[in-house]
Amino acid sequence: MCGILAVLGCSDFTQAKRVRVLELSRRLKHRGPDWSGLHQHGDCYLAHQRLAIVDPASGDQPLFNEDKSIIVTVNGEIYNHEELRKQLPNHQFRTGSDCDVIAHLYEEHGENFMDMLDGIFSFVLLDTRDNTFIVARDAIGVTSLYIGWGLDGSVWISSEMKGLNDDCEHFEVFPPGHLYSSRERAFRRWYNPTWFSESIPSAPYDPLAVRHAFEKAVIKRLMTDVPFGVLLSGGLDSSLVASITSRYLATTKAAEQWGSKLHSFCVGLEGSPDLKAAKEVADYLGTVHHEFTFTVQDGIDAIEEVIYHVETYDVTTIRASTPMFLMSRKIKSLGVKWVISGEGSDEIFGGYLYFHKAPNKEEFHTETCRKIKALHQYDCLRANKSTFAWGLEARVPFLDKEFINVAMNIDPEYKMIKRDEGRIEKYILRRAFDDEEKPYLPKHILYRQKEQFSDGVGYSWIDGLKDHAAKHVTDKMILNAGNIFRHNTPLTKEAYYYRMIFERFFPQNSARLTVPGGPTVACSTAKAVEWDAAWSNNLDPSGRAALGVHLSAYDDKQNNLINNKPVEFEKLIPMEAPSLGVAIHS
Protein backbone atom coordinates (compact mmCIF):
# COMPACT_ATOMS: atom_id res chain seq x y z
CA MET A 1 0.00 0.00 0.00
CA CYS A 2 0.97 3.62 -0.21
CA GLY A 3 0.14 7.26 0.31
CA ILE A 4 -1.93 9.19 -2.21
CA LEU A 5 -2.67 12.87 -2.74
CA ALA A 6 -4.88 14.38 -5.44
CA VAL A 7 -5.89 17.94 -6.24
CA LEU A 8 -8.78 17.97 -8.69
CA GLY A 9 -10.24 20.94 -10.53
CA CYS A 10 -7.88 23.59 -9.19
CA SER A 11 -7.60 27.04 -10.76
CA ASP A 12 -3.80 27.21 -10.61
CA PHE A 13 -1.77 25.30 -13.24
CA THR A 14 1.55 27.06 -12.58
CA GLN A 15 4.88 25.47 -11.72
CA ALA A 16 4.46 26.90 -8.23
CA LYS A 17 1.30 24.82 -7.79
CA ARG A 18 3.09 21.68 -8.96
CA VAL A 19 5.88 22.36 -6.48
CA ARG A 20 3.29 22.81 -3.71
CA VAL A 21 1.60 19.50 -4.53
CA LEU A 22 4.98 17.76 -4.47
CA GLU A 23 5.75 19.38 -1.13
CA LEU A 24 2.46 18.17 0.35
CA SER A 25 2.94 14.71 -1.13
CA ARG A 26 6.29 14.45 0.64
CA ARG A 27 4.41 14.78 3.93
CA LEU A 28 3.17 11.27 3.13
CA LYS A 29 6.58 9.87 2.18
CA HIS A 30 6.73 7.69 5.30
CA ARG A 31 3.80 5.70 3.85
CA GLY A 32 5.65 4.92 0.63
CA PRO A 33 9.44 5.21 0.78
CA ASP A 34 10.08 3.06 -2.31
CA TRP A 35 8.94 5.40 -5.09
CA SER A 36 7.12 8.67 -5.70
CA GLY A 37 5.24 9.95 -8.71
CA LEU A 38 3.17 12.94 -9.81
CA HIS A 39 0.93 13.12 -12.86
CA GLN A 40 -0.71 16.33 -14.04
CA HIS A 41 -3.57 16.48 -16.50
CA GLY A 42 -4.92 19.98 -16.98
CA ASP A 43 -6.32 21.18 -13.68
CA CYS A 44 -5.80 17.84 -11.90
CA TYR A 45 -2.76 16.56 -10.01
CA LEU A 46 -2.37 12.93 -8.87
CA ALA A 47 0.56 12.23 -6.55
CA HIS A 48 1.70 8.96 -5.07
CA GLN A 49 4.19 7.62 -2.52
CA ARG A 50 4.65 3.88 -3.04
CA LEU A 51 5.35 1.02 -0.66
CA ALA A 52 6.13 -1.78 -3.13
CA ILE A 53 4.72 -5.16 -2.07
CA VAL A 54 3.23 -6.78 -5.21
CA ASP A 55 5.29 -6.42 -8.41
CA PRO A 56 7.84 -4.05 -6.84
CA ALA A 57 9.80 -3.79 -10.10
CA SER A 58 7.12 -2.42 -12.43
CA GLY A 59 4.07 -1.45 -10.41
CA ASP A 60 4.87 2.24 -9.97
CA GLN A 61 1.99 4.70 -10.08
CA PRO A 62 -0.10 6.39 -11.31
CA LEU A 63 -1.59 3.44 -13.20
CA PHE A 64 -3.26 3.69 -16.62
CA ASN A 65 -5.44 1.82 -19.06
CA GLU A 66 -4.12 0.95 -22.54
CA ASP A 67 -4.43 4.42 -24.11
CA LYS A 68 -3.76 6.28 -20.84
CA SER A 69 -7.15 7.96 -20.92
CA ILE A 70 -7.93 6.54 -17.46
CA ILE A 71 -5.50 7.46 -14.69
CA VAL A 72 -5.55 5.93 -11.20
CA THR A 73 -3.62 6.58 -8.03
CA VAL A 74 -4.41 4.01 -5.38
CA ASN A 75 -3.51 2.93 -1.88
CA GLY A 76 -4.59 -0.66 -1.53
CA GLU A 77 -4.30 -4.39 -1.92
CA ILE A 78 -6.71 -6.18 -4.28
CA TYR A 79 -6.58 -9.82 -3.21
CA ASN A 80 -8.66 -11.16 -6.11
CA HIS A 81 -6.77 -9.29 -8.84
CA GLU A 82 -5.74 -12.48 -10.67
CA GLU A 83 -9.37 -13.61 -10.89
CA LEU A 84 -10.43 -10.15 -12.08
CA ARG A 85 -7.77 -10.15 -14.80
CA LYS A 86 -9.31 -13.35 -16.18
CA GLN A 87 -12.65 -11.52 -16.41
CA LEU A 88 -11.01 -8.85 -18.58
CA PRO A 89 -9.62 -10.91 -21.50
CA ASN A 90 -9.73 -8.03 -23.97
CA HIS A 91 -7.57 -5.74 -21.84
CA GLN A 92 -3.80 -5.39 -21.82
CA PHE A 93 -2.24 -4.78 -18.42
CA ARG A 94 0.84 -2.61 -18.18
CA THR A 95 2.10 -4.03 -14.84
CA GLY A 96 1.71 -6.98 -12.52
CA SER A 97 0.40 -4.74 -9.74
CA ASP A 98 -2.74 -5.99 -8.03
CA CYS A 99 -4.23 -2.49 -8.38
CA ASP A 100 -3.78 -2.43 -12.16
CA VAL A 101 -7.26 -3.93 -12.60
CA ILE A 102 -9.06 -0.79 -11.35
CA ALA A 103 -8.73 1.32 -14.52
CA HIS A 104 -9.84 -1.60 -16.70
CA LEU A 105 -12.82 -2.45 -14.48
CA TYR A 106 -13.92 1.16 -14.81
CA GLU A 107 -13.72 0.91 -18.60
CA GLU A 108 -16.00 -2.14 -18.51
CA HIS A 109 -18.43 -1.23 -15.74
CA GLY A 110 -18.25 2.51 -15.20
CA GLU A 111 -18.63 3.47 -11.54
CA ASN A 112 -20.37 0.21 -10.61
CA PHE A 113 -17.45 -2.12 -9.95
CA MET A 114 -16.60 -1.48 -6.31
CA ASP A 115 -18.32 -4.63 -5.05
CA MET A 116 -16.12 -6.67 -7.39
CA LEU A 117 -12.98 -5.65 -5.50
CA ASP A 118 -11.99 -8.04 -2.72
CA GLY A 119 -9.47 -6.12 -0.69
CA ILE A 120 -8.70 -2.82 0.96
CA PHE A 121 -8.31 0.37 -1.02
CA SER A 122 -8.56 4.11 -1.36
CA PHE A 123 -8.22 5.46 -4.88
CA VAL A 124 -8.74 8.42 -7.17
CA LEU A 125 -9.64 7.67 -10.79
CA LEU A 126 -9.50 10.41 -13.41
CA ASP A 127 -11.31 9.91 -16.72
CA THR A 128 -9.57 12.31 -19.10
CA ARG A 129 -12.14 11.69 -21.84
CA ASP A 130 -14.65 13.96 -20.08
CA ASN A 131 -12.45 15.22 -17.24
CA THR A 132 -14.54 13.54 -14.54
CA PHE A 133 -13.28 11.65 -11.53
CA ILE A 134 -14.37 9.21 -8.85
CA VAL A 135 -12.95 8.58 -5.39
CA ALA A 136 -13.65 5.44 -3.37
CA ARG A 137 -12.75 3.89 -0.02
CA ASP A 138 -12.91 0.25 1.09
CA ALA A 139 -15.90 -1.21 2.92
CA ILE A 140 -14.78 -0.83 6.54
CA GLY A 141 -12.16 1.88 6.16
CA VAL A 142 -9.01 -0.15 6.73
CA THR A 143 -7.18 2.33 4.51
CA SER A 144 -7.23 5.93 5.71
CA LEU A 145 -8.62 8.71 3.51
CA TYR A 146 -9.63 12.37 3.79
CA ILE A 147 -11.44 14.74 1.45
CA GLY A 148 -11.25 18.53 1.40
CA TRP A 149 -12.43 21.51 -0.60
CA GLY A 150 -10.47 24.61 -1.58
CA LEU A 151 -11.81 28.13 -1.96
CA ASP A 152 -11.14 27.90 -5.71
CA GLY A 153 -13.60 25.01 -6.03
CA SER A 154 -10.94 22.31 -6.03
CA VAL A 155 -11.43 18.89 -4.43
CA TRP A 156 -8.54 17.46 -2.42
CA ILE A 157 -7.96 13.81 -1.52
CA SER A 158 -5.25 12.55 0.83
CA SER A 159 -4.36 9.35 2.68
CA GLU A 160 -3.61 11.45 5.74
CA MET A 161 -4.95 14.72 7.06
CA LYS A 162 -1.52 16.36 7.01
CA GLY A 163 -1.56 16.24 3.21
CA LEU A 164 -4.43 18.72 2.87
CA ASN A 165 -5.20 20.46 6.17
CA ASP A 166 -3.16 23.59 5.39
CA ASP A 167 -4.63 24.14 1.91
CA CYS A 168 -8.35 23.38 2.29
CA GLU A 169 -11.12 25.61 3.55
CA HIS A 170 -12.92 22.54 4.89
CA PHE A 171 -11.96 18.87 5.10
CA GLU A 172 -13.33 15.69 6.66
CA VAL A 173 -12.92 11.94 6.87
CA PHE A 174 -13.90 10.23 3.62
CA PRO A 175 -16.63 7.77 4.70
CA PRO A 176 -15.82 4.04 4.38
CA GLY A 177 -17.79 2.04 1.85
CA HIS A 178 -18.57 5.16 -0.17
CA LEU A 179 -17.83 6.57 -3.60
CA TYR A 180 -17.61 10.25 -4.50
CA SER A 181 -18.42 11.15 -8.10
CA SER A 182 -17.61 14.49 -9.70
CA ARG A 183 -20.60 13.99 -11.98
CA GLU A 184 -22.96 14.10 -9.00
CA ARG A 185 -20.77 16.13 -6.64
CA ALA A 186 -22.00 13.81 -3.89
CA PHE A 187 -21.19 10.68 -1.90
CA ARG A 188 -22.88 7.36 -2.62
CA ARG A 189 -22.63 4.32 -0.38
CA TRP A 190 -21.57 1.30 -2.43
CA TYR A 191 -21.18 -1.12 0.52
CA ASN A 192 -24.64 -2.34 1.55
CA PRO A 193 -24.42 -5.64 3.47
CA THR A 194 -27.50 -7.01 5.23
CA TRP A 195 -26.05 -6.35 8.70
CA PHE A 196 -25.71 -2.63 7.98
CA SER A 197 -29.41 -2.09 8.69
CA GLU A 198 -28.82 -3.51 12.21
CA SER A 199 -31.77 -5.89 11.84
CA ILE A 200 -31.38 -8.96 14.05
CA PRO A 201 -30.10 -12.03 12.13
CA SER A 202 -31.40 -15.52 12.78
CA ALA A 203 -28.94 -17.93 11.12
CA PRO A 204 -27.75 -20.82 13.31
CA TYR A 205 -24.14 -20.97 14.42
CA ASP A 206 -22.01 -23.30 12.31
CA PRO A 207 -18.49 -23.54 13.78
CA LEU A 208 -17.04 -24.96 10.59
CA ALA A 209 -18.45 -22.10 8.52
CA VAL A 210 -16.79 -19.60 10.86
CA ARG A 211 -13.52 -21.52 10.77
CA HIS A 212 -13.38 -21.93 7.01
CA ALA A 213 -14.36 -18.31 6.33
CA PHE A 214 -11.62 -17.00 8.59
CA GLU A 215 -8.98 -19.36 7.23
CA LYS A 216 -9.85 -18.17 3.74
CA ALA A 217 -9.57 -14.54 4.89
CA VAL A 218 -6.09 -15.13 6.30
CA ILE A 219 -4.80 -17.16 3.35
CA LYS A 220 -5.83 -14.62 0.70
CA ARG A 221 -3.82 -11.98 2.59
CA LEU A 222 -0.59 -13.91 2.15
CA MET A 223 -0.27 -12.38 -1.35
CA THR A 224 3.21 -10.83 -1.44
CA ASP A 225 6.49 -10.39 -3.29
CA VAL A 226 8.32 -9.12 -0.19
CA PRO A 227 9.11 -10.35 3.37
CA PHE A 228 6.33 -10.23 5.98
CA GLY A 229 5.45 -11.33 9.51
CA VAL A 230 2.64 -11.53 12.04
CA LEU A 231 1.88 -9.33 15.05
CA LEU A 232 1.47 -11.66 18.01
CA SER A 233 0.26 -10.40 21.39
CA GLY A 234 -0.59 -13.84 22.73
CA GLY A 235 -4.30 -13.05 22.89
CA LEU A 236 -6.94 -15.03 21.06
CA ASP A 237 -7.17 -12.94 17.89
CA SER A 238 -3.50 -12.50 17.03
CA SER A 239 -2.78 -16.10 18.07
CA LEU A 240 -5.41 -17.47 15.69
CA VAL A 241 -4.03 -15.32 12.88
CA ALA A 242 -0.51 -16.59 13.62
CA SER A 243 -1.68 -20.20 13.85
CA ILE A 244 -3.51 -20.16 10.52
CA THR A 245 -0.69 -18.28 8.79
CA SER A 246 1.86 -20.74 10.13
CA ARG A 247 -0.29 -23.70 9.13
CA TYR A 248 -0.84 -22.61 5.51
CA LEU A 249 2.28 -20.58 4.73
CA ALA A 250 4.15 -23.53 3.22
CA THR A 251 1.47 -23.89 0.52
CA THR A 252 1.72 -20.28 -0.71
CA LYS A 253 3.91 -18.53 -3.28
CA ALA A 254 5.35 -16.45 -0.44
CA ALA A 255 7.01 -19.56 1.00
CA GLU A 256 8.79 -20.20 -2.31
CA GLN A 257 10.39 -16.76 -2.15
CA TRP A 258 10.92 -16.18 1.57
CA GLY A 259 10.77 -19.60 3.19
CA SER A 260 8.07 -21.33 5.19
CA LYS A 261 9.30 -20.14 8.59
CA LEU A 262 6.94 -17.47 9.93
CA HIS A 263 8.33 -14.48 11.82
CA SER A 264 6.26 -13.16 14.73
CA PHE A 265 6.56 -9.87 16.62
CA CYS A 266 5.45 -8.71 20.04
CA VAL A 267 5.93 -5.55 22.11
CA GLY A 268 5.50 -4.81 25.80
CA LEU A 269 6.98 -3.49 28.98
CA GLU A 270 9.40 -5.85 30.68
CA GLY A 271 7.38 -8.69 32.24
CA SER A 272 4.07 -7.66 30.64
CA PRO A 273 1.22 -10.16 30.08
CA ASP A 274 1.50 -9.98 26.29
CA LEU A 275 5.21 -10.82 26.18
CA LYS A 276 4.74 -13.94 28.24
CA ALA A 277 1.68 -15.17 26.34
CA ALA A 278 3.15 -14.36 22.92
CA LYS A 279 6.34 -16.29 23.67
CA GLU A 280 4.30 -19.32 24.65
CA VAL A 281 2.25 -19.18 21.43
CA ALA A 282 5.36 -18.62 19.32
CA ASP A 283 7.04 -21.65 20.88
CA TYR A 284 3.92 -23.73 20.26
CA LEU A 285 3.71 -22.67 16.60
CA GLY A 286 7.46 -22.74 15.99
CA THR A 287 7.72 -19.19 14.67
CA VAL A 288 10.90 -17.12 14.58
CA HIS A 289 9.86 -14.83 17.41
CA HIS A 290 11.02 -11.25 17.92
CA GLU A 291 10.30 -9.67 21.29
CA PHE A 292 10.60 -5.91 21.70
CA THR A 293 10.50 -4.20 25.07
CA PHE A 294 10.05 -0.53 25.80
CA THR A 295 9.98 1.59 28.94
CA VAL A 296 7.24 3.95 30.00
CA GLN A 297 9.65 6.80 29.27
CA ASP A 298 10.26 5.46 25.74
CA GLY A 299 6.53 5.64 25.13
CA ILE A 300 6.14 9.09 26.64
CA ASP A 301 9.00 10.37 24.48
CA ALA A 302 7.15 9.13 21.38
CA ILE A 303 3.71 10.58 22.19
CA GLU A 304 4.09 13.72 20.07
CA GLU A 305 5.22 11.72 17.04
CA VAL A 306 2.37 9.28 17.56
CA ILE A 307 -0.25 12.03 17.63
CA TYR A 308 1.27 13.63 14.53
CA HIS A 309 1.18 10.35 12.60
CA VAL A 310 -2.08 8.86 13.88
CA GLU A 311 -3.89 12.22 13.70
CA THR A 312 -6.18 11.84 16.69
CA TYR A 313 -6.58 12.97 20.28
CA ASP A 314 -8.69 9.95 21.28
CA VAL A 315 -7.23 8.57 24.53
CA THR A 316 -7.59 4.83 23.90
CA THR A 317 -6.23 5.14 20.36
CA ILE A 318 -3.12 7.00 21.51
CA ARG A 319 -2.51 4.58 24.38
CA ALA A 320 -2.60 1.60 22.01
CA SER A 321 -0.90 3.29 19.06
CA THR A 322 2.28 4.16 20.94
CA PRO A 323 3.55 0.60 21.55
CA MET A 324 2.52 -0.32 18.00
CA PHE A 325 4.39 2.72 16.65
CA LEU A 326 7.55 1.73 18.55
CA MET A 327 7.30 -1.90 17.45
CA SER A 328 6.71 -0.98 13.80
CA ARG A 329 10.00 0.89 13.65
CA LYS A 330 11.85 -2.18 14.91
CA ILE A 331 10.03 -4.49 12.50
CA LYS A 332 10.80 -2.30 9.49
CA SER A 333 14.48 -2.21 10.48
CA LEU A 334 14.54 -6.00 10.01
CA GLY A 335 13.57 -5.65 6.34
CA VAL A 336 9.92 -6.63 6.80
CA LYS A 337 7.43 -4.66 4.68
CA TRP A 338 4.07 -5.81 5.98
CA VAL A 339 2.46 -7.67 8.85
CA ILE A 340 -0.80 -9.48 9.41
CA SER A 341 -2.73 -8.47 12.51
CA GLY A 342 -5.84 -9.29 14.57
CA GLU A 343 -7.91 -6.09 14.63
CA GLY A 344 -11.69 -6.30 14.24
CA SER A 345 -12.58 -9.48 16.11
CA ASP A 346 -13.82 -7.72 19.25
CA GLU A 347 -16.20 -5.57 17.25
CA ILE A 348 -17.62 -8.50 15.29
CA PHE A 349 -18.00 -10.95 18.18
CA GLY A 350 -18.60 -8.56 21.07
CA GLY A 351 -15.25 -9.30 22.65
CA TYR A 352 -14.82 -6.14 24.70
CA LEU A 353 -15.36 -6.64 28.40
CA TYR A 354 -18.36 -4.32 28.60
CA PHE A 355 -20.35 -6.71 26.38
CA HIS A 356 -20.85 -8.80 29.54
CA LYS A 357 -23.47 -6.20 30.45
CA ALA A 358 -25.48 -6.39 27.22
CA PRO A 359 -29.10 -6.73 28.41
CA ASN A 360 -30.33 -8.82 25.48
CA LYS A 361 -29.30 -10.14 22.09
CA GLU A 362 -30.84 -7.19 20.25
CA GLU A 363 -28.71 -4.66 22.16
CA PHE A 364 -25.68 -6.92 21.77
CA HIS A 365 -26.07 -7.08 17.99
CA THR A 366 -26.78 -3.40 17.39
CA GLU A 367 -23.71 -2.51 19.46
CA THR A 368 -21.51 -4.79 17.32
CA CYS A 369 -22.93 -3.06 14.23
CA ARG A 370 -22.15 0.36 15.69
CA LYS A 371 -18.64 -0.75 16.60
CA ILE A 372 -17.85 -2.10 13.12
CA LYS A 373 -19.15 1.08 11.50
CA ALA A 374 -16.85 3.15 13.75
CA LEU A 375 -13.72 1.02 13.30
CA HIS A 376 -12.21 3.47 10.81
CA GLN A 377 -12.03 6.06 13.61
CA TYR A 378 -10.34 3.77 16.13
CA ASP A 379 -8.56 0.43 15.57
CA CYS A 380 -8.28 0.77 11.78
CA LEU A 381 -6.83 4.24 12.25
CA ARG A 382 -4.30 2.87 14.73
CA ALA A 383 -3.37 -0.21 12.71
CA ASN A 384 -2.96 1.78 9.51
CA LYS A 385 -1.17 4.91 10.66
CA SER A 386 1.04 3.69 13.51
CA THR A 387 2.55 1.08 11.17
CA PHE A 388 2.69 3.27 8.07
CA ALA A 389 4.58 5.88 10.07
CA TRP A 390 7.55 3.60 9.33
CA GLY A 391 6.52 2.34 5.88
CA LEU A 392 5.03 -0.89 7.25
CA GLU A 393 1.67 -2.21 6.06
CA ALA A 394 -0.82 -4.01 8.34
CA ARG A 395 -3.36 -6.49 6.94
CA VAL A 396 -6.44 -7.39 8.98
CA PRO A 397 -8.23 -10.64 8.02
CA PHE A 398 -11.01 -10.28 10.60
CA LEU A 399 -12.27 -7.35 8.49
CA ASP A 400 -12.57 -9.44 5.35
CA LYS A 401 -15.94 -8.69 3.72
CA GLU A 402 -16.91 -12.34 3.29
CA PHE A 403 -15.93 -13.23 6.85
CA ILE A 404 -17.89 -10.30 8.28
CA ASN A 405 -20.95 -11.43 6.34
CA VAL A 406 -20.68 -14.94 7.81
CA ALA A 407 -20.09 -13.75 11.38
CA MET A 408 -22.69 -10.97 11.36
CA ASN A 409 -25.40 -13.24 9.98
CA ILE A 410 -25.29 -15.49 13.06
CA ASP A 411 -28.12 -15.18 15.58
CA PRO A 412 -26.55 -12.94 18.26
CA GLU A 413 -27.90 -15.19 21.00
CA TYR A 414 -24.91 -17.43 20.26
CA LYS A 415 -22.52 -14.51 20.86
CA MET A 416 -24.02 -13.47 24.19
CA ILE A 417 -21.64 -13.68 27.15
CA LYS A 418 -23.09 -15.77 29.99
CA ARG A 419 -20.48 -16.35 32.66
CA ASP A 420 -22.82 -18.44 34.81
CA GLU A 421 -23.08 -20.87 31.89
CA GLY A 422 -19.37 -20.82 31.08
CA ARG A 423 -19.71 -18.73 27.92
CA ILE A 424 -16.97 -16.13 27.92
CA GLU A 425 -16.46 -13.36 25.37
CA LYS A 426 -16.00 -14.54 21.76
CA TYR A 427 -16.97 -18.06 22.76
CA ILE A 428 -18.19 -18.99 19.27
CA LEU A 429 -14.88 -17.94 17.72
CA ARG A 430 -12.93 -19.91 20.32
CA ARG A 431 -15.09 -22.96 19.80
CA ALA A 432 -14.75 -22.81 16.01
CA PHE A 433 -11.00 -23.39 16.42
CA ASP A 434 -11.19 -25.87 19.30
CA ASP A 435 -9.97 -28.88 17.31
CA GLU A 436 -8.93 -31.94 19.30
CA GLU A 437 -7.32 -33.79 16.37
CA LYS A 438 -5.13 -30.95 15.11
CA PRO A 439 -5.15 -28.14 17.70
CA TYR A 440 -4.67 -24.60 16.50
CA LEU A 441 -3.63 -23.36 19.95
CA PRO A 442 -3.15 -24.59 23.51
CA LYS A 443 -6.43 -24.60 25.45
CA HIS A 444 -5.45 -21.91 27.93
CA ILE A 445 -4.48 -19.57 25.10
CA LEU A 446 -7.63 -20.38 23.14
CA TYR A 447 -9.64 -19.37 26.21
CA ARG A 448 -7.44 -16.54 27.48
CA GLN A 449 -9.53 -13.55 28.56
CA LYS A 450 -9.55 -10.34 26.56
CA GLU A 451 -6.88 -7.70 27.24
CA GLN A 452 -7.00 -4.28 25.62
CA PHE A 453 -3.75 -3.84 23.70
CA SER A 454 -2.72 -0.86 25.84
CA ASP A 455 -3.33 -2.95 28.99
CA GLY A 456 -1.72 -6.13 27.71
CA VAL A 457 1.61 -4.45 26.90
CA GLY A 458 1.89 -3.65 30.63
CA TYR A 459 -0.50 -2.19 33.19
CA SER A 460 2.01 0.44 34.32
CA TRP A 461 1.94 1.94 30.81
CA ILE A 462 -1.41 3.67 31.34
CA ASP A 463 -0.52 4.71 34.88
CA GLY A 464 2.71 6.22 33.58
CA LEU A 465 0.82 8.21 30.94
CA LYS A 466 -1.57 9.59 33.54
CA ASP A 467 1.27 10.59 35.84
CA HIS A 468 3.09 12.33 32.99
CA ALA A 469 -0.01 14.24 31.92
CA ALA A 470 -0.62 15.37 35.50
CA LYS A 471 2.76 17.11 35.46
CA HIS A 472 1.76 19.18 32.43
CA VAL A 473 -1.94 19.86 33.02
CA THR A 474 -3.13 21.71 36.13
CA ASP A 475 -6.48 21.52 37.91
CA LYS A 476 -7.22 25.06 36.73
CA MET A 477 -6.67 24.02 33.12
CA ILE A 478 -9.23 21.23 33.50
CA LEU A 479 -11.74 23.63 35.09
CA ASN A 480 -11.49 25.90 32.05
CA ALA A 481 -11.27 23.12 29.45
CA GLY A 482 -14.81 23.78 28.21
CA ASN A 483 -13.91 27.34 27.31
CA ILE A 484 -10.73 26.36 25.47
CA PHE A 485 -11.93 23.18 23.75
CA ARG A 486 -15.63 23.57 23.07
CA HIS A 487 -15.84 20.48 20.86
CA ASN A 488 -15.11 17.15 22.58
CA THR A 489 -14.06 18.92 25.78
CA PRO A 490 -11.35 16.85 27.52
CA LEU A 491 -12.46 15.65 30.96
CA THR A 492 -9.16 14.26 32.24
CA LYS A 493 -5.62 15.59 32.38
CA GLU A 494 -4.45 12.83 30.05
CA ALA A 495 -7.08 13.78 27.45
CA TYR A 496 -6.22 17.48 27.82
CA TYR A 497 -2.51 16.75 27.31
CA TYR A 498 -3.17 14.85 24.07
CA ARG A 499 -5.52 17.55 22.86
CA MET A 500 -2.90 20.28 23.34
CA ILE A 501 -0.43 18.35 21.20
CA PHE A 502 -3.03 17.60 18.52
CA GLU A 503 -4.09 21.26 18.26
CA ARG A 504 -0.49 22.29 17.77
CA PHE A 505 -0.16 20.03 14.72
CA PHE A 506 -3.72 20.40 13.42
CA PRO A 507 -5.23 23.73 14.56
CA GLN A 508 -8.11 23.83 12.07
CA ASN A 509 -11.70 23.36 13.20
CA SER A 510 -12.14 20.71 10.50
CA ALA A 511 -9.31 18.72 12.09
CA ARG A 512 -10.83 18.55 15.55
CA LEU A 513 -14.15 17.47 14.02
CA THR A 514 -12.53 14.36 12.50
CA VAL A 515 -12.04 12.82 15.96
CA PRO A 516 -15.00 11.06 17.62
CA GLY A 517 -16.04 11.83 21.18
CA GLY A 518 -18.67 11.07 23.78
CA PRO A 519 -18.80 8.88 26.89
CA THR A 520 -17.23 5.43 26.75
CA VAL A 521 -16.27 2.56 29.02
CA ALA A 522 -13.88 -0.21 27.99
CA CYS A 523 -14.08 1.03 24.36
CA SER A 524 -17.89 1.08 24.22
CA THR A 525 -20.04 3.41 22.17
CA ALA A 526 -21.93 6.13 24.04
CA LYS A 527 -25.16 4.14 23.69
CA ALA A 528 -23.72 1.09 25.50
CA VAL A 529 -22.73 3.21 28.52
CA GLU A 530 -26.44 3.10 29.35
CA TRP A 531 -26.19 -0.64 30.05
CA ASP A 532 -24.85 -0.03 33.57
CA ALA A 533 -25.70 3.01 35.69
CA ALA A 534 -22.33 2.74 37.43
CA TRP A 535 -20.60 3.60 34.16
CA SER A 536 -22.23 7.00 33.70
CA ASN A 537 -19.58 8.84 35.73
CA ASN A 538 -16.60 6.86 34.48
CA LEU A 539 -13.76 8.94 33.03
CA ASP A 540 -11.27 6.15 32.21
CA PRO A 541 -11.90 4.35 28.90
CA SER A 542 -9.64 1.42 29.86
CA GLY A 543 -10.99 -2.11 29.98
CA ARG A 544 -10.21 -2.07 33.70
CA ALA A 545 -13.12 0.32 34.12
CA ALA A 546 -15.54 -2.59 33.62
CA LEU A 547 -15.32 -3.50 37.28
CA GLY A 548 -15.96 -7.10 38.22
CA VAL A 549 -15.49 -8.37 34.67
CA HIS A 550 -11.74 -8.47 34.15
CA LEU A 551 -10.51 -11.43 36.18
CA SER A 552 -6.99 -12.46 37.07
CA ALA A 553 -8.07 -16.08 36.74
CA TYR A 554 -11.05 -17.89 35.27
CA ASP A 555 -13.82 -19.12 37.53
CA ASP A 556 -14.61 -22.82 37.68
CA LYS A 557 -16.85 -22.85 34.63
CA GLN A 558 -14.30 -21.02 32.55
CA ASN A 559 -11.62 -23.42 33.74
CA ASN A 560 -13.80 -26.25 32.47
CA LEU A 561 -13.24 -24.89 28.96
CA ILE A 562 -9.50 -25.08 29.39
CA ASN A 563 -9.63 -28.52 30.98
CA ASN A 564 -11.48 -30.19 28.11
CA LYS A 565 -14.99 -29.66 29.49
CA PRO A 566 -16.64 -27.09 27.23
CA VAL A 567 -20.13 -25.84 28.04
CA GLU A 568 -22.93 -27.78 26.38
CA PHE A 569 -23.88 -25.02 23.99
CA GLU A 570 -26.51 -26.97 22.09
CA LYS A 571 -28.73 -27.26 25.16
CA LEU A 572 -29.12 -23.49 25.07
CA ILE A 573 -30.01 -23.18 21.38
CA PRO A 574 -30.69 -25.94 18.83
CA MET A 575 -27.81 -26.21 16.42
CA GLU A 576 -26.87 -28.31 13.41
CA ALA A 577 -23.90 -30.58 14.10
CA PRO A 578 -20.86 -30.23 11.83
CA SER A 579 -20.84 -32.83 9.09
CA LEU A 580 -17.50 -32.37 7.37
CA GLY A 581 -15.52 -34.74 9.54
CA VAL A 582 -13.42 -32.07 11.28
CA ALA A 583 -13.21 -32.49 15.03
CA ILE A 584 -14.99 -29.62 16.79
CA HIS A 585 -15.12 -30.10 20.55
CA SER A 586 -18.72 -29.86 21.76
From Swiss-Prot:
Q: Which Gene Ontology BP annotations are present?
A: L-asparagine biosynthetic process
**Domain Glutamine amidotransferase type-2, first and last residues per copy:** 2-185
UniProt GO cellular component terms: cytosol
Q: In which pathway does it act?
A: Amino-acid biosynthesis; L-asparagine biosynthesis; L-asparagine from L-aspartate (L-Gln route): step 1/1
Q: Which Gene3D superfamilies match?
A: Glutamine Phosphoribosylpyrophosphate, subunit 1, domain 1, HUPs
- Quick one: which residues bind ATP? L231, V267, S341, G342
Q: What domain of life does the UniProt record list for this protein's source?
A: Eukaryota
Q: What is its EC number?
A: 6.3.5.4
Which residues are catalytic? C2
Where is the Asparagine synthetase domain positioned along the sequence?
A: 193-516
InterPro entries noted in UniProt:
Asn_synth_AEB, Asn_synthase, Asn_Synthetase, AsnB_N, GATase_2_dom, Ntn_hydrolases_N, Rossmann-like_a/b/a_fold
**Keywords (A to Z) from UniProt:** Amino-acid biosynthesis, Asparagine biosynthesis, ATP-binding, Glutamine amidotransferase, Ligase, Nucleotide-binding
Q: Which SUPFAM superfamilies match?
A: Adenine nucleotide alpha hydrolases-like, N-terminal nucleophile aminohydrolases (Ntn hydrolases)
According to UniProt, where does the site described as Important for beta-aspartyl-AMP intermediate formation lie?
E343
- Reaction catalysis annotation: L-aspartate + L-glutamine + ATP + H2O = L-asparagine + L-glutamate + AMP + diphosphate + H(+)
Q: Which GO terms describe its molecular function?
A: asparagine synthase (glutamine-hydrolyzing) activity; ATP binding
- Name the PANTHER family on file: ASPARAGINE SYNTHETASE, ASPARAGINE SYNTHETASE [GLUTAMINE-HYDROLYZING]
**Record protein name field:** Asparagine synthetase [glutamine-hydrolyzing] 1
Tell me what organism the protein belongs to: Lotus japonicus
